Amino acid sequence: YTQLSILNHSQWINIDGAPETQALSLGTKLSEKIGIGFSAFNDRIGPARNTSSSVDFAYHLKLNEKNLKLGLGLKMSGRLNSLDLSGIRTVQSGDNSFLVQTQNELNLNFGAGFYLYNPKFYLGMGIPFLIEEDTFNIQRNFYLVLGGIFKISDNLQLKPSLLVQKTAEIETIYDNSIWAVVNDRFWFGPQYRASLKNVLPSQKAGGYFGAIAGVYISKNLSLGYAYQGATGNQRLGITNTTHEILLRFQFLSKYRGVLRSPRLF
């Protein structure tokens, strides 16, 4: 199959310089064992912007006769970090911190990861950026993902998932969600983020409560929406909420004359 995903992430709606993210990814299998992918990413917050693109390669190994497989992946990416201070208004003119109006830096980086999976379970770990960079504070992040899908009835399945993120000098945080999947077409459920030090979401760790919902519009097209509301005090009248929209195209191949079922992960 070939899959194309388009994502838009918006935070602090109606605030100038609010965080925004756009992402595009394309992946396909060249054979039963080899897959390749391409992704592009644009992230902006205030005067800072990060634009990157990457090429991914994956090799899949079949571990047993029960469809347990291991995917090993490598990533090569180019990242342009930009800082434009020309629109910043300061209290005092001539502030030395703002003498350099623009700053740009291009970095080449590499990533690696693995993905262990079967039709009902997955476990993965990845490091998107192996090389750290000081000027724009690019740190090495470790990601761990774990999830599965459980059949409750012919029309209902539950899909719990966990994402753990570890960065040096920052609290280890995790995102947790559980979806209800109805008729292999609709899904919805709660999600939240917290840190290992704070079991419940807290503003300090960027915690939030949220919800996610989606639908397969057709066998090849799905649409998802996620809402996140941060915890803690709201300051300066800013509504610290996040909206995320995902559009996914799946061009499914035929195997022995039978169309494969929609992918849930």
Locate each region found by the language model:
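Subset of outer-membrane beta-barrel
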Residues: 1-265
